[in-house]
Amino acid sequence: RFPAHLQQCDMESNGKSVNRFGERVNYVTGPIIFGEPGTNGQHSFYQLLHQGTDIVPLQFVGFKDSQIGTDVVIEGSTSQKKLCANVAAQIVAFACGKDDENKNKNFEGGRPSSIIIGDQLTPESLGSLLAHFENKIMFQGFVWNVNSFDQEGVQLGKLLAKRVLAHDTDAALKA
């Protein structure tokens, strides 16, 4: 659940509407982070990403070799090779698109993406990825002039939940 971890780190750290001095910002801070391993996202959010009206910059992470060292050959290639082919194909599809007379099958392309490719998922490569993304989050916070190290936005929900559990709905509604 690496995407979920990055989601928590990034969105909780930089999802702010005020800067370090408490002044409202007039620019977007903190991207929306989501993802799924392998091809799990293909029948959910990939549809929106390929043909939706919002253009969402994407970042893929992939590995050349299976993390377990052995792999099953299915229809002439390993599952790892199929995953690598799929990530490469998705990047081409997002970038280039495909014209079709049937507008339901038309893909505009021009959708930005990047990829980080490693040899194999190991403790060392996972640590490198974590360091990469944690530093990205920290530097984005510096650039946006937000405090990436407080999470005041989650406190209100916790406070209100306690009031609701205590059947103090009047206080919950006034908070």
Indicate residue ranges for each PLM-predicted region.
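A SIS-like phosphosugar-recognition module
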Residues: 1-175
